[in-house]
Amino acid sequence: ASGVINYFFQGKFTILLRVDGKSYITTNATTIVSVASKLIQIGLMLTGFDVVMVQFSYFVVNLLQMIYISLYVKKHYAWLDLSVEPDYASLSQSKNVIIHQVSGLIFNNTDIIVLTLFCDLKTVSVYSLYSLIVSCVSNIIDMLCSSVEFVLGQAFNSNRNYFLKLQEVYETYYLGISFFFFTVTLIMLPSFMRVYSQGITDAQYVDKYLPLLFVTLNVLMYARRTSSQIINFAGHFKQTQVRSIIESAINLTVSLVLVFKIGMYGVLIGTIEALFYRTNDV
């Protein structure tokens, strides 16, 4: 319930703070709420309250976060008139955006769904662990690089010459950080898996090919990230929706063909082939 209320009442404020370079407001609030709610939940469980009351406490703490964000926006954006008639023309590509989102949903979940349907749970477990580790690395990169995205968006819509210079610097910085972290991941991941899986015999977690495939997949994904941002800044969703659909189709088709022959390697190769197409065509 808190997620639905958050989306409907706080979503617009979150976007406003993001494009104004104040994402740290929502990030700090979310961090405090997360820690506070966990402490309260632990306290309630230790004192014998049932699960309904524990979840209700989480709901109440999240409501306090929404109230705080709303008050912050009203105080620092007093000029903002929420009673103005919405400009629906600005949302003329909403259907195209939905196509992108659905296509992205299919693309991002093809691997795990195909493995769940056509492989055993041990294979899914190995894939999920590798994916979790690489996702943590991706979160670090995003945390370091996403804080300046709003500057790029503002420059794109106000000063194209300045944007081109800024984009070149940002792309170099972004790719450099990405390659550094994924290179370290490629080197350290096998050793981590040997330590993690010590004593585990039901599944083979140590694999010489999986680190390379996972890192290759993510390097390709991050190599196109800066170009994809330009599409978002320019609002060219309709012009690129077919390419997004083709990318998902390639991933799904190749994964379904290869999963029966080489298992987990097959779905990863399918994703890599789709990324090769989209990275060159973006």
What are these regions (language model features)?
Residues V51-V52, A89-Q93, V97, L115-S135, ...:
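Interfacial/gating helices of multi-pass transporter permease domains
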Residues G3-G11, Q65, Q101-T110, S128-V151, ...:
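Small-residue-rich midsections of specific transmembrane alpha-helices
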Residues T27-K75, A89-Q93, H100, S131-V134, ...:
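Hydrophobic alpha-helical transmembrane segments
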Residues V51-Y58, I67-N109, I113, V151-K165, ...:
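Interhelical loop/hinge segments that connect adjacent transmembrane helices in multipass membrane
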Residues G3-N28, V52, T216-I246, V282:
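Membrane-interface junctions at transmembrane-helix termini in multi-pass inner-membrane proteins
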Residues G43-G48, L105-C136, V151-A155, P190-D202:
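Helix-terminus/linker motif at the lipid-water interface of multi-pass membrane proteins
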Residues A1, M188-V219, R225, Y265:
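Interfacial segments at transmembrane-helix termini and the short loops linking adjacent helices
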Residues R18-V19, V134-E171, S227-F233:
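Helix-loop junctions and terminal segments of transmembrane helices
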